[in-house]
């Protein structure tokens, strides 16, 4: 915490540092009516050796999906996948996901990507499933480094503190390894997502990222090294994206004291959000989807006026993290994953939110023609596009209908 405080205390000097990167009025396809649809993808639905060592042989997050139960009146659980409990590390299963995504208008899978001081985690999703799928070139992909603490919430007991399993903070040496790895292994893939030729790479937890280096200047220098390595590999630049929020969710997350000064001062090229609830409090057990949408739009307006770099808006499918709770514990709004939920998140209301988001983007000539969606498969957080036995392909059909390409 001392190091973090020292980083934040230096932010007063950040305004003196020139901001690099793509300005809002230079963003990709700013005059197009076609919007690039990016879907986050959470890859914990396969067998991972670390998970099995901790949680038992054969464990994946599907176990939490299967074991979920209704926790209050009108609560629809468990969620049942229409395709069954697929193995995303199997290229055939991943090919099914790719075909479905492309058919319904998803252009990019933005994978939650994990790498800690002792190496990669959950990497089989991309390395074995996606990159070996026979149709992988139909869709683009990119990485969001999910550099948050990995804590024990699989499931979480109400009165037991979440044990820290893998710290999100890494050494500067580890970050250098990460830079080399992603450039060589992922950026050079022909279907890696690029903006104006620059590979897109997003960082999820900015306070944790700053802790890695101990000072603002050292953090900025690390980013510059990453950028220079990317250029040395033959790319015109790196498109570095920052995720930020005003409301921490997972234990260990923190907010930025001055996000604009930090994000722009460090030289990020764009900024975005991961999920609506990072900006909107869920004040009721069943908080209405349309109300959350409207509150998020207020945040979007604030972000657009505060940042001089492009803000990429988010559309969330829903929120219900109750499957990650110990099902025999009483349920209430006591802290993640014991949280209030989003209700009324029907495919029809999701479609309306998409249309409103599209209209807001197209009404702003400076806005990048990009939106992201949470999420392809956050089943245990109640925010997923994949078909289930209740709504079928409804959320995907909403994307297809609203985001028709010319």
What are these regions (language model features)?
Residues 1-6:
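Positively charged n-region of N-terminal signal peptides that target proteins for export
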Residues 7-18:
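Bacterial N-terminal signal peptides
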Residues 26-406:
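Glycan-processing catalytic domains of CAZymes
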């Amino acid at each position: 915490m001392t190091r973090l405080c020292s980083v934040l205390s230096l932010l007063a000097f950040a305004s003196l540092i020139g901001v690099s990167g793509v300005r809002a009025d230079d963003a990709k396809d700013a005059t197009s009516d076609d919007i690039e649809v990016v879907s986050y993808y959470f890859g914990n639905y396969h067998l991972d050796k670390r998970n099995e060592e901790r949680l038992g042989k054969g464990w994946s997050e599907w176990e939490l999906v299967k074991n979920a139960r209704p926790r209050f009146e009108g609560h629809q659980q468990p969620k049942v996948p229409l395709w069954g409990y697929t193995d995303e590390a199997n290229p055939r299963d991943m090919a099914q996901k790719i075909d479905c995504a492309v058919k319904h208008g998803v252009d990019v899978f933005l994978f939650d990507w994990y790498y800690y001081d002792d190496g990669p985690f959950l990497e089989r999703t991309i390395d074995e499933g996606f990159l070996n799928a026979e149709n992988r070139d139909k869709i683009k992909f990119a990485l969001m480094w999910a550099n948050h603490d990995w804590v024990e919430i699989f499931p979480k007991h109400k009165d037991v503190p979440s044990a820290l399993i893998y710290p999100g903070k890494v050494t500067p040496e580890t970050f250098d390894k990460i830079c080399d790895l992603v450039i060589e292994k992922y950026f050079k893939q022909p279907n890696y997502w690029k903006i104006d030729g620059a590979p897109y790479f997003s960082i999820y937890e900015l306070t944790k990222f700053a802790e890695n280096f101990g000072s603002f200047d050292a953090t900025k220098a690390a980013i510059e090294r990453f950028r220079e390595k990317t250029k040395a590999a033959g790319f015109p630049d790196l498109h570095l994206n920052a995720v930020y929020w005003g409301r921490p969710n997972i234990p260990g997350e923190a907010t930025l004291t001055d996000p604009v000064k930090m994000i722009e001062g460090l030289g990020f090229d764009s900024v975005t959000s991961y999920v609506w609830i990072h900006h909107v409090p869920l004040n009721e057990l069943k908080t209405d989807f349309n109300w959350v949408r409207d509150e998020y739009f207020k945040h979007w307006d604030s972000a657009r006026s505060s940042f001089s770099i492009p803000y990429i808006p988010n559309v969330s499918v829903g929120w219900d993290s109750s499957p990650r709770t110990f099902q025999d514990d009483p349920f209430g709004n006591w802290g993640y994953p014991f949280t209030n939920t989003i209700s009324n998140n029907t495919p029809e209301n999701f479609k309306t939110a998409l249309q409103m988001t599209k209209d807001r983007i197209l009404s702003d000539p400076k806005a990048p023609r990009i939106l992201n969606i949470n999420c392809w498969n956050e089943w245990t957080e109640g925010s997923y596009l994949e078909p289930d036995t209740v709504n079928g392909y409804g959320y995907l059909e909403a994307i297809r209908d609203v985001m028709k390409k010319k």
